[in-house]
C-alpha cells in the first residue's frame, strides 16, 4: 500500500484509484479481484499506519545510529526501532546462560516389574543413597494409580512466522530463506500470499479448502486418506483474518509439474500442504498413567503414556518420514504394564542417579521468531490484535541485518550475540532497547491501521523520544569511547592551517578541527 501511495503522491496524481486486493496469483482469484475492486479510500488508514512505521524506523534509526556512533567513535553502532530490542533479547539470554551456576541433585530409583520408578529431586547425595539402601531387595507396593485421558487439538494453519519457525526447526532454513522460497512459490501460483499474520481462512472458503485438500492427496501424497472427513470449518473464521488469510497451497498444484520445483521450495510447499491436512484432521488422543509405589518407607513414582488415537499426528509423522530433518528427536512414549493399587513387586533393585540443573537454552531462529512475536504479550490484554516486535514480513530482514552488521552470529542452529553486540546493548539506554516499548508501538500502529488511533499522536511520541535521546546523551568519557575502538587518538603533529592536532583516521591523517 505504502509503495504505491508514495509514487502516487510524488507524481502529483489526483486521479481516483481502485484497489485490487487478492491473496493468490491464480487466474480465478485475480479475475474475482478485478470484478470486486475496492475504493482506494478504504485503505487510507492502512497507508497512514505504513507511513508511520516508515517514518518511525527512519527517525529512530537515523538519529540513534548517528548519535551513538559519534559518541563512541570507531565502529558504526546501528540502532533500530525493532532490531535493537531483538538484539537486547539475545544479549539478555546470553547473560543468563553465562551467569548460570549448575547445581547437582539426585534421585533414588527402584527397578520393579520392568519399571524404573524414582523419588522426587533430592539435594544431598547421602540422603539419596540412604533411601536406595533402605529399599534394596525389599518389596514395593503400588499405593496409587492415576489415569487421565488427554487431547491435543490440531494445529492452526500457517502464518508467515509459524511457517518460518517450523522450517527452521525441521529443515534448518533461516527465516529469510523461508520467505524467499515462499515468495517464489507464490509467484508460481502454488501457494497463497506469504506475508500474512493470520492463521485462519475466511468463512467463504470452505469449498476452496476441500478442493485443495483433494489436490494435496493427489499431488503431494504423504499417506493414504484415513477415511475421516476433513473438518475444514475448524480453520475458518473471518473475524480472525486480517489483511490476508493463512498460507495454504493453491489448486495449481494439481496442474503443475512439481518435479521441476527446486528442493527448498518443495519442502516449504510440503510443509504448507501437510499443515492443511493436520489442521483439518482429527484430534490426537492419549492416556497418561502415573503410579506411586511405597518401598522401604519411601515413595517412588513412575509415569507412562499410551496413544489412543494418533489423529492429525499421522500426517506430521508422514512428513518427517518423507524428509531428512534437523529437528531434535522426541522421546519415545513409555507404556507401563497394567497396574492396580495393592500390587506388589518382590526383591526390587535400586540405584542412585546424579543430575544437574540446566541453564536456559540459546535462541535458535525458531525460538527467536517466537520471542519476537510474543514480546510484550504478557502486559497486553487478550483483545490486543498485534503483539511483538516487527511484522511477519520484516522479522527475517531484522535478523539478517543483525548478522550482517556483526552484532549476531550463527553457530549451527544457535543465534548468539557477538562481543560487539553485547557491548552495544550495554551502552544503549533502556528506552531504545525495550521489547515492551516496541511492542506497544506495534500495537499503536495496528490501531492507526484500524482508524482507532491518530497518526499524528503516534509520530509525536516518536519525535519526543528521539529529541529526548539527543538531549540526554551528548558526551561520554574516553574510557567509554574505547569500547568500540574510539577514544583518545595519537597526535601526529599540528595542522599548518589552524594549528590544531593532526590525528590518523580510517582513511588517513586529518585535522581534528576539520578546518
Regions found by a protein language model. Name each.
Residues 1-373, 381-387, 393-407, 412-414, ...:
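Toprim catalytic domain recognition across nucleic-acid enzymes
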Residues 72, 464-515:
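Functional cation/ligand-contacting sites centered on basic and imidazole/sulfhydryl donors
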Residues 135, 272-273, 462-469:
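Short amphipathic C-terminal alpha-helix that caps PH/PH-like domains
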Residues 137, 447-455:
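Short loop/turn hinge sites at secondary-structure boundaries
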Residues 170, 456-460:
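Intrinsically disordered, low-complexity terminal tails
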Residues 283-284, 379, 455-456, 473-480:
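Short, flexible/disordered secondary-structure transition segments
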Amino acid at each position: 500500500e505504502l509503495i504505491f501511495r508514495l509514487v502516487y503522491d510524488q507524481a502529483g496524481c489526483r486521479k481516483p484509484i481502485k484497489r485490487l486486493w487478492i491473496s493468490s496469483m491464480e487466474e480465478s482469484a485475480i479475475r474475482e479481484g478485478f470484478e470486486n475492486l475496492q475504493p482506494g479510500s478504504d485503505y487510507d488508514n492502512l497507508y497512514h499506519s505504513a507511513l508511520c512505521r516508515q517514518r518511525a524506523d527512519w527517525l529512530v534509526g537515523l538519529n540513534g545510529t548517528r548519535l551513538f556512533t559519534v559518541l563512541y567513535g570507531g565502529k558504526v553502532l546501528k540502532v533500530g526501532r525493532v532490531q535493537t530490542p531483538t538484539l537486547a533479547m539475545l544479549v539478555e539470554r546470553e547473560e543468563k546462560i553465562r551467569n548460570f551456576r549448575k547445581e547437582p541433585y539426585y534421585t533414588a530409583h527402584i527397578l520393579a516389574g520392568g519399571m524404573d520408578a524414582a523419588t522426587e529431586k533430592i539435594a544431598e547425595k547421602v540422603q539419596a543413597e540412604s533411601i536406595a539402601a533402605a529399599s534394596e531387595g525389599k518389596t514395593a507396593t503400588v499405593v496409587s494409580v492415576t489415569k487421565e485421558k488427554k487431547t491435543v487439538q490440531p494445529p492452526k494453519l500457517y502464518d508467515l512466522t509459524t511457517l518460518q519457525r517450523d522450517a527452521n526447526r525441521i529443515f534448518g532454513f533461516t527465516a529469510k530463506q523461508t520467505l524467499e522460497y515462499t515468495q517464489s512459490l507464490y509467484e508460481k501460483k502454488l501457494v497463497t500470499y506469504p506475508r500474512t499474520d493470520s492463521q485462519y481462512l475466511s468463512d467463504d472458503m470452505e469449498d476452496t479448502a476441500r478442493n485443495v485438500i483433494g489436490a494435496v492427496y493427489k499431488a503431494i501424497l504423504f499417506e493414504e486418506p484415513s477415511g475421516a472427513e476433513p473438518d475444514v470449518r475448524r480453520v475458518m473464521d473471518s473475524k480472525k483474518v486480517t489483511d490476508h488469510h493463512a498460507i495454504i497451497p493453491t489448486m495449481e498444484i494439481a496442474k503443475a509439474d512439481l518435479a521441476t520445483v527446486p528442493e527448498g521450495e518443495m519442502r516449504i510447499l510440503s510443509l504448507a500442504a501437510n499443515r492443511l491436512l493436520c489442521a483439518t484432521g482429527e484430534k490426537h488422543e492419549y492416556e497418561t498413567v502415573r503410579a506411586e509405589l511405597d518401598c522401604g518407607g519411601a515413595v517412588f513414582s513412575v509415569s507412562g503414556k499410551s496413544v489412543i488415537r494418533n489423529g492429525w499426528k499421522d500426517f506430521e509423522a508422514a512428513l518427517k518420514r518423507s524428509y531428512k530433518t534437523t529437528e531434535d528427536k522426541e522421546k519415545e512414549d513409555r507404556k507401563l504394564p497394567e497396574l492396580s493399587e495393592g500390587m506388589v513387586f518382590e526383591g526390587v533393585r535400586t540405584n542412585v542417579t546424579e543430575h544437574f540443573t540446566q541453564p536456559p537454552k540459546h535462541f535458535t531462529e525458531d525460538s527467536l521468531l517466537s520471542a519476537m512475536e510474543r514480546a510484550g504479550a504478557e502486559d497486553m490484554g487478550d483483545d490486543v490484535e498485534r503483539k511483538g516486535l516487527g511484522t511477519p514480513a520484516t522479522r527475517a530482514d531484522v535478523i539478517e541485518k543483525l548478522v550482517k552488521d556483526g552484532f549476531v552470529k550463527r553457530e549451527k542452529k544457535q543465534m548468539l550475540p557477538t562481543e560487539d553486540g553485547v557491548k552495544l546493548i550495554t551502552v544503549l539506554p533502556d528506552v531504545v532497547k525495550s521489547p515492551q516499548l516496541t511492542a506497544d508501538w506495534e500495537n499503536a500502529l495496528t490501531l492507526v491501521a484500524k482508524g482507532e488511533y491518530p497518526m499524528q499522536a503516534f509520530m509525536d511520541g516518536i519525535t519526543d523520544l528521539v529529541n529526548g535521546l539527543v538531549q540526554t546523551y551528548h558526551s561520554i568519557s574516553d574510557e567509554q569511547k574505547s569500547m568500540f575502538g574510539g577514544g583518545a587518538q595519537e597526535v601526529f603533529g599540528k595542522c599548518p592551517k589552524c594549528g590544531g592536532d593532526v590525528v590518523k583516521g580510517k582513511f588517513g591523517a586529518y585535522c581534528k578541527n576539520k578546518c
